[in-house]
Amino acid sequence: TYDLVLQAVGRTPNGKKIAADKAGVAVTDRGFINVDIQMRTNVPHIFAIGDIVGQPMLAHKAVHEAHVAAEVAAGELLGNPELAAAAFNARVIPSVAYTDPEVAWVGLTEDQAKAQGIKVKKGLFPWAASGRAIANGRDEGFTKLLFDDSPEAHGHGKILGGGMVGTHAGDMIGEIALAIEMGADAVDIGKTIHPHPTLGESIGMAAEVAHGSCTDVPPARR
């Protein structure tokens, strides 16, 4: 039995409580502040970042939004066009569900790709074939990568998204985010030498599955 159950269902924006309107900043009916990809509000010299600009409400997203806003402001002040051109790319925000096992993902999902009519090639590596996962006694889970498989990619499509289910998935999702940021393809990731035995090498294995060169996947059960 329990004496108390705490249900946390999200955050409520306080845009209507900070007198933003007195500075001319527009606030939505729900209390959010709309910004562009440089984190500017409707008032060009005022920026906003974090939960108040909308989903996803994540600390690491807010930090990078702050970096963008600071770079743009500094670039304009110093006359540095490279800094002034900084922009926030929302497609490379990793998300983690801190459950047991953990679930982590970044970039495009299969459902999103299907909805957008994007043809993808999937590489899925089961942790049941991971030496480290087996040694840990936690081989439930998998690593999945999605690559552009459109005709224009000519078989060398860049990575569009990826996800992991398993222990410490959140600690490893950053590598997939970096691969998306750098425009890596399956060969790039598969040829990256990962230490063995580690959970992280499942990322390289998943890329090899997509490429058709993985030799570590167990045969399908009959």
Labelled PLM ranges:
Residues 14-19, 85-91, 126:
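Poly-acidic low-complexity segments
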Residues 93, 98-222:
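Flexible, glycine-rich terminal cap/loop adjacent to redox cofactors
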Residues 40-41, 45, 89-90, 136-138:
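Solvent-exposed alpha-helices and their adjacent loops that cap or buttress functional pockets
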Residues 56-64, 71-112:
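Rossmann-like dinucleotide-binding cores of NAD(P)H-dependent redox enzymes
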Residues 4-82, 171, 175-177:
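FAD-site-proximal beta/loop scaffold in flavoenzymes
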